[in-house]
Amino acid sequence: EEVCLALGIYARRVRFLPYSPFDFDCHVVTEIYDRSQEKWYMLDPTTNGYLVDEQGTILSLLEARERMADTRFVTYCKATSREKNLQKLYRKNISRTAYYAKNLFRIQVDAVSQFGESGNWLNFPPEHFSIREWSVASAEYRLEMVPAYAKGYADFDEAVQLPRMREAVE
C-alpha cells in the first residue's frame, strides 16, 4: 500500500477474516484504485497474486466475496503464471482460492490510507452479522484457552492480559 501511495496510486490496506470466532486467522492485502475504470483491484503482496473472474478480470475483495457467496467463478492467479486457461488455473490453485473463500467473510479497510497504520478500520460484514457478538465469543474462547495460548509467548503477562480480556467480554 505504502509503495503505491508514494507513487501517487490510490491504495488501501484490507484485512479479511473468517466467520468463526475460534479461528484467529486473517490475511492482509492491498487494493489499488484505477481511476479510469472507477474500480478497486486486489493485489496480494504476500502471495504475489490476485483474484479473477471467468473473463480474467481482476476483482476487488468485495466483488470476490459476492461472487463466492453466489457460487460464481473466482480463482487465484499467481502474478508470474503464464497459464491462460482459467479452468486449469482454478484446479491448480484450488487450495489458495479456498483459503481466500474461508477468510472472505468479514472485510476491514483502513479508515484512512496513509503511511503506517492508523489502527482505525471500517468494517464490511455481511448483512445481519453482529461484530459485537463475534468479538464476545472470540474473547470468551481466548479466555478459556489462555494457558495454552500464552505458553507460546514469553512476553504474555497473564496478570495484565486476563483482566483486559475479561473487560472486553463484559
Regions from the PLM with identified roles:
Residues 1-15, 30:
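Cysteine-centered nucleophilic/redox motifs
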